[in-house]
From Swiss-Prot:
First-tier enzyme category under EC: transferase
Name assigned to this protein: Porphobilinogen deaminase
Record keyword Transferase present: yes
Pathway in which the depicted protein is active: Porphyrin-containing compound metabolism; protoporphyrin-IX biosynthesis; coproporphyrinogen-III from 5-aminolevulinate: step 2/4
EC number, UniProt record: 2.5.1.61
Cofactor(s) required, per the database record: dipyrromethane
GO biological process, one term: protoporphyrinogen IX biosynthetic process
Misc. comment: The porphobilinogen subunits are added to the dipyrromethane group.
Catalytic activities: 4 porphobilinogen + H2O = hydroxymethylbilane + 4 NH4(+)
Keyword line: Porphyrin biosynthesis, Transferase
The keyword Metal-binding is annotated on this UniProt entry: no
UniProt cross-references to InterPro entries, sorted A to Z: HemC, Porphobilin_deaminase_N, Porphobilinogen_deaminase_C, Porphobilinogen_deaminase_C_sf
């Protein structure tokens, strides 16, 4: 059996797809090949995502490949997948999640707490920028886009003191040795779905059940809880929003942030994990009452 899996052209996207292919090979005797697609989001790098249509730009061209039957499935970073799926598509599986934290990288190995006053920090994320300003109001936030390697190179090129990147991506491309500091998930609440990969298929695909074996239940319901929080707040790349759900002894804890009326609101909620979607919605409602 031959499967074609669509993904973006970046090194990270290809590595993430190879992770899924390896998992498939362990579960089933399946031959897989990658279909590399340059998405609109990959082509336009000089403009921030919220000005050109959001993170869905990394997904739409790949969905077209599935519609045209050039691909059987797609692998995405779940943080790039809009909460509203197009008709006829679904996320069939979310494998075990990687480290959800954000990392600080400084080429001179200067710790975040030791940064000079007015230090220039590169990030294109509204969520990261807002939380950086809460931690250090004096910081100068510089927008940067591009793949992981490009952003790291921009530290020198743009004379930055450091940048913020997701730990998961750095680990997957074997660059986590560059990390200077790890942010705790309470001081820097991650993006919705950060660290998780999602396998997208068309609902009518005859072999879609093969992917279900790759699902990691706790990882999936944590991401779904975060996405319920985002959906209730109608969050997207125009929003300053983040959430992280974790499970211990069947109890789910979610921390979320959202910018409302020019104020960053942070709330937490705890409940049984079988109520994951209701917990995400309830957390959003708490924030809206603030």
């Amino acid at each position: 059996m031959n499967f074609v899996i669509a993904t973006r052209r970046s090194k990270l996207a290809q590595v993430q797809t190879e992770i899924i292919i390896d998992l498939l090979n362990k579960k089933h005797d399946i031959e897989c090949e990658k279909l590399l697609i340059e998405t609109v989001g990959d082509k336009i790098l000089e403009v921030s995502l919220d000005k050109i249509g959001g993170k869905g730009l990394f997904v739409k061209d790949i969905e077209v490949a599935m519609l045209e039957q050039r691909a059987d499935a797609a692998v995405h970073s779940m943080k790039d997948v809009p909460y509203e799926m197009p008709k006829g598509f679904e996320i069939i599986a979310i494998p075990e999640r990687e480290d959800v934290r954000d990392a600080f990288i400084s080429l001179d190995n200067i710790k975040f707490k030791d940064l000079r006053k007015g230090a220039k920090i590169g990030t294109s994320s509204r969520r990261r920028a807002a939380q950086l300003k809460l931690l250090r109001p004096d910081l100068d936030i510089v927008p940067i886009r591009g793949n992981v390697q490009t952003r790291i190179e921009k530290i020198k090129k743009e004379n930055l003191d450091g940048i913020i990147l997701a730990v998961a991506g750095l680990k997957r491309v074997n660059l986590d040795h560059l990390i200077t500091d790890y942010f705790d998930t309470k001081e820097m609440v991650p993006a919705i779905g950060q660290g998780a990969l999602g396998i997208e298929v068309m609902e009518e695909h005859p072999k879609k059940e093969l992917f279900k074996d790759l699902d990691h239940y706790n990882s999936k319901i944590c991401v779904l809880a975060e996405r319920a929080f985002m959906r209730e707040l109608d969050g997207d790349c125009h929003s300053t929003i983040g959430a992280y759900a974790s499970i211990k002894d069947n109890i789910m804890h979610i921390i979320g942030i959202f910018e409302r009326k020019n104020k960053i609101i942070k709330k937490e909620i705890t409940g049984t994990k079988d109520q994951y979607e209701k917990l995400g919605i309830a957390l959003a409602e708490h924030i809206l009452k603030d």
